[in-house]
UniProtKB/Swiss-Prot annotation:
It comes from Locusta migratoria (Migratory locust). Sequence repeats lie at residues 7-10, 48-51, 55-58, 60-63, 66-69. The sequence shown here is that of isoform LM-70A. This is Cuticle protein 70, isoforms A and B. Keywords: Cuticle, Repeat. The tetrapeptide (A-A-P-[AV]) repeats found throughout the protein are also present in many proteins constituting the protective envelope of other species. Component of the cuticle of migratory locust which contains more than 100 different structural proteins.
Length: 88
């Protein structure tokens, strides 16, 4: 899932507490999306994506929001054999 794809690599390669703190917001966001996905089954998420059906939000919104972060971490992730969101 998102938490496994985004948070696990950060935690696994973070040698210093400062890195863990820096990545904490991403963990919160991923966890929030997971909870929203469970709670709202067919209701559009107005704040995150007003014009996108709820079913597409858990996939589209986090990926779009995380794209710059994924790009920034790609060399590190690839170097360690991690796959973001299950994609290698």
């Amino acid at each position: 899932g998102y938490l496994g794809g985004y948070a696990a690599p950060a935690v696994a390669v973070a040698p210093a507490p400062a890195l863990a703190v820096a990545h904490a917001p991403a963990v919160v966001v991923a966890t929030s999306y997971a909870r929203i996905s469970q709670v709202t089954n067919s209701v559009p998420i107005a704040v995150a994506a007003p014009a996108v059906p709820k079913a597409a939000v858990p996939v589209a919104a986090p990926v779009v929001a995380a794209a710059p972060v994924i790009a920034a971490h790609a060399p590190l992730a690839l170097g360690h054999g991690f796959g973001y969101g299950g994609y290698h």
